[in-house]
């Protein structure tokens, strides 16, 4: 039995609130249960130096957590003068995932930066960030079309993510903190709306997992992400 009473395949209640802030071209508050992340997409009419003159755009991301997003206060990374390894890993994952959804040549020499700020963490912050960031990215692109800086959308399709794992010997989907902290295996999966894999990050925290357990986790991820993509599209239509 899971702490929340959910079935093994059930994701947490998910809410995607668009236009959450006033100034960004795209902004979303995404909630996976008690995990809450603000995702803002900002457009710049330039690209990194190494892309200048190449006729393509760029999508990047930054990630951070408020000091009291967790049970105990974490020191702000800015106060130590550098980002931690976990932060850098997560923001690179978010950026790679978003770029898989975009035709960078069709974007032209423009850059979109998506900032993902965790205001409350209860497991799955990176997967929630990717899911919310994708919606914010679509809104930013639509804003560019309205302003005339893009003629058509470079979005190839939706991208979403979910965590899966082995908890008490059973494969489960969308782990909350109590499950994540006690899981034998923890895995994050990013997929396209067609069910193609973008990234799989999996680690056995205790006992090694079998090939059969891997397939079970991936099957849960595929079904969970399909449900999440449906929620993304519903949010964009609202």
Swiss-Prot record:
Which SUPFAM superfamilies does UniProt cross-reference here?
Answer: Ribonuclease PH domain 2-like, Ribosomal protein S5 domain 2-like
| Enzyme Commission number | 2.7.7.56
TM ranges: none
> Carries keyword Secreted?
no
Q: Which UniProt keywords apply?
A: Nucleotidyltransferase, RNA-binding, rRNA processing, Transferase, tRNA processing, tRNA-binding
According to its UniProt entry, one GO biological process term is: rRNA processing
A Pfam family it matches: RNase_PH_C
Name the PROSITE patterns for this protein: RIBONUCLEASE_PH
GO MF term set:
3'-5'-RNA exonuclease activity; tRNA binding; tRNA nucleotidyltransferase activity
**Which reactions are catalysed by this chain?**
tRNA(n+1) + phosphate = tRNA(n) + a ribonucleoside 5'-diphosphate
The residues listed in the UniProt record as binding phosphate, with positions renumbered to this chain, are: 86, 124-126
Q: Could you say which enzyme class this protein belongs to?
A: transferase
What does this chain do? Phosphorolytic 3'-5' exoribonuclease that plays an important role in tRNA 3'-end maturation. Removes nucleotide residues following the 3'-CCA terminus of tRNAs; can also add nucleotides to the ends of RNA molecules by using nucleoside diphosphates as substrates, but this may not be physiologically important. Probably plays a role in initiation of 16S rRNA degradation (leading to ribosome degradation) during starvation.
* Quaternary data: Homohexameric ring arranged as a trimer of dimers.
**What HAMAP family would the database entry show?**
RNase_PH (MF_00564)
Q: Which family does it belong to?
A: Belongs to the RNase PH family.
Name the chain's protein: Ribonuclease PH
According to the entry, what is the taxonomic lineage of the organism? Bacteria, Pseudomonadati, Pseudomonadota, Gammaproteobacteria, Vibrionales
């Amino acid at each position: 039995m899971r702490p929340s009473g959910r079935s093994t395949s059930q994701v947490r209640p998910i809410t995607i609130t668009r236009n959450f802030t006033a100034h960004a071209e795209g902004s979303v508050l995404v909630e996976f249960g008690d995990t809450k992340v603000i995702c803002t997409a900002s457009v710049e009419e330039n690209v990194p130096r190494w892309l200048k003159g190449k006729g393509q755009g760029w999508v990047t991301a930054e990630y951070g957590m408020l000091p009291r997003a967790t049970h105990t206060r974490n020191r702000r990374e800015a106060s130590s003068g550098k980002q931690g390894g976990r932060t850098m890993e997560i923001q690179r994952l978010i950026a790679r995932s978003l770029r898989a959804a975009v035709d960078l040549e069709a974007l032209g020499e423009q850059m979109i930066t998506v900032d993902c700020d965790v205001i409350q963490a209860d497991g799955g912050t990176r997967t929630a960030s990717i899911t919310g960031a994708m919606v914010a990215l679509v809104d930013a692109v639509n804003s560019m079309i309205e302003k005339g800086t893009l003629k058509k959308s470079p979005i190839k399709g939706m991208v979403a993510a979910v965590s899966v794992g082995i908890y008490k010997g059973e494969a489960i989907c969308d782990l909350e903190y109590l499950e994540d902290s006690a899981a034998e295996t923890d895995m994050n999966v990013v997929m396209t709306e067609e069910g193609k894999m973008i990234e799989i990050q999996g680690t056995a925290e205790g006992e090694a997992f079998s090939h059969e357990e891997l397939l079970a986790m991936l099957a849960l991820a595929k079904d969970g992400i399909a449900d999440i993509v449906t929620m993304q599209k519903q949010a964009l239509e609202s």
